[in-house]
Amino acid sequence: MSLRKFIRRGIGLLGFLWFVSVYAYPIPDSIAVRLQGFVSALEQFGKALPQEKVYLHFDNTSYYQGDQIWFQCYVVTSEFNRPTAWSKTLYVELLNPGGEIVSRQILPIRNGRCQGNFTLTHLPFYSGFYEVRAYTKYMLNFGEATVFSRIFPVFDKPDSEGDYTQKEICRHPGKYPQKREKTRKEKKLNLRFYPEGGTLIRDVPVRVAFEATDAFGNPVDVSGCILNKEKEVVSTFRTSHEGKGVFTYVADTEEVKAEVVWRDKKYRFSLPEAEEQGFAFSVDNLSIPDSLAITVQKNRFTAAQVLGVAVMSRGKLYNFCMLTVKRNQPFSFRLDKKNLPVGVSQLVLFDKAGQVLADRLVFVGKPDTLSLAVRTDKEQYLPYDSIGISFEVNDPQGQPAQTLLSVSVRDGREEVESRHSMLTDLLLMSEIKGYVRRPSWYFESDDTLHRRALDELLMVQGWRRYEWKHWAGVEPFELKYLPEQGIELHGQVVSMVRSKPRPDVQVTSFLTKRGEEDNPTDQNTSCFDVFTTDSSGRFSFISQVEGKWNLILSVSEKGKKKDHRIVLDRVFHPEPRRYSMAELQVHISGDEKVSLPDTQLNDTVFMQENMEQLFKAYEDSLRKLGMDEKIHRIDEVVVKAKKLDKAAEVYKTRTKSIAYYDVASEMDDIQDRNGFIGDDIHELMINMNSEFYREHSPGGQEYLFYKGRMVLFAINYERTYHNEMDYNKYRLLPLEAIKSVYISEDFGTICRYADPRFTPINIDKLYRCVVLIETYPEDQISVKGGKGVRKTWLEGYSEVKDFYQPDYRVLPKENDYRRTLYWNPALSTDEQGKAYIRFYNNSRCKYPRITVETLTEDGKIGVFRQ
């Protein structure tokens, strides 16, 4: 039996392998085996490591300072969109416009669902575009782009309560810490080209998709032509939907330009450079309902090769064929697409080395969704009226569906336009890259216009969620994280100086719940365990705790304490993503008006001065006034100003700050990154905020600088006087005594806590910020861990709040301006697929807006949007 026959029979388990040979050229056995090896690796990878996806349904489309953000999480497997049985823990994070995580929830996944909320009351607060992202730790194995991310405008609290026509955001956010890469405005007109398959091939016709956008990323309609050196037209093009379109072009060695006329002005753009050798790869997904029409063509400079074509969808291999391409003519064939699942499929053309020569994304099928009927008991409602809503859910066959609904009812007045749904996210947005203006439009109809526009979208914004080089075994894949089964803690014991792993040492852990330290013997509030590190010095444990717990870890070897360091694997959150300019726009429902944020100001650079000379000049000025003594008596005065309440002063100071740090958490984070700061507060500040740095005077005195000027430290909101004892008092504080730190650049705040003998001019010349240190009460200061001991904390599952529903059977005296009238993340339908809710209106809504989403156990999606 020949090897080829053996392959045909042996890999019949795949059920879809077939060979295409142009002009009956045979396929060598050695090449067939190599191509099949990549496909086998691809299939096994998909089975062994299926991916997960996350979708969040939110209660509203925008928020104001002080609002609650409510959300329902759906965690599914990518293959069938069914509730995941893998990961049991979901991380949901709220990031401010600068990319700082201001709140985080750790939620237990049960039957693929969990729920939570954030409160927009953190300090310091500044309005802008906030990001909510969600992921399982297991998802991070496949890249940060797999993380669910949604951007919301968060507006300043309106001047008049309930005036939601006022949509103001911070116009100068650059003064706040910026961890997010800055969004930059583009040219007036931008034209980008995307050859089908990935590249232009010399002397071969290639379909080229393109996208035209303005400076803010908005799609624009243009028409134009391709001009050669002689300015002759070799091809023409025109946008079809949302600034996108496709034209066919044969590239050669000549330099060509694309010319368009927009707003009565001509613009010229360069096309991608053509490859001297290669294969053009074209996929027609529109002409034949049940097949993919594929065309492969090489040019005369490209040697004949045996190639493979793989068809994947949702992380699973669905089809594979081999073909020999020897002649410089197009070769076309068809692949059946009836067995492909609804959604995005990826076709890959690859060679015997496993290298991708070309690939293409296509959308196959029509979503088979649930039917959701929603009815209100009245057409119009009065203030504080009782609102009744009925729901009925049926499967695609018309049978009642018993499922859990996430339901949001809102006062839709001046509502920001919603652009997403579970359907668009799970089937489309999670498979492509970049911003899509209105993804729901592509699912409004199954006609030629919508199908062609969706095909062009995938040619322009195609992103490979499933990395070929890893799946096919071309490059090794590192599995960093297994699906978590609870609150997992992983760590490593290393030597103090050289950070060498310490195997076979004992790690003792002691957990006590925050606030329950006085009951260490209570099994519900404390836990004790002992582990032994493996050959790499690693250890781990799993728990199901809720809330925040104190954790003490100690290291011993043969019964003796060892001065080793314990590093915990808790720094795994993704980097904040860069916003596109198109995302930073607000569309009001039913209105095309767009609000744009102001461009961020560039950071100001300040000149440094010799601080010792400045202080000396200041002291000399005091002596001239006869104030060289430490204590001075003044005549009796009458103070007429009203004294500011201390609590009010503290709150006001916090609101004007630009950054907040929980010092214990920050120190833990530094240690988890295998860093060391000892008791140096300057080192702590530098680690927490990159704007801080050290400067040394000629006399060797160390100063901390911030954005070009010195830093003023104030402890517990008390003034800092310019004398040796008071000015350096902050450096004597043990870091364990510091509860939190606020940074303020507000000039009034700096003056409030600076030495009152300084003039405002001197203060402005001297200080750039004030670091406000808040300390623990003396009896609450933690004792520093001893030899081989690490005192830290364990974050358990977050405590979930319930949405508040007011009872207006007795009318209230005050107005009610709630924007979210009703939120239920888990409303259950009965056996007839029906459910009913009743709640009270606010003081002005007439026509509530309703959004309902659901996902059944077999992966059927249901969406209702009003």
Model-assigned labels for residue ranges:
Residues 72-73, 130-138, 348, 851-855:
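Internal, hydrophobic beta-strand segments that form the core of beta-sheet-rich folds
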Residues 116-120:
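Ligand-binding face of N-terminal immunoglobulin V-set domains in extracellular IgSF glycoproteins
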Residues 30-52, 57, 63-64, 68-108, ...:
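Contiguous segments within soluble domain cores/interaction surfaces
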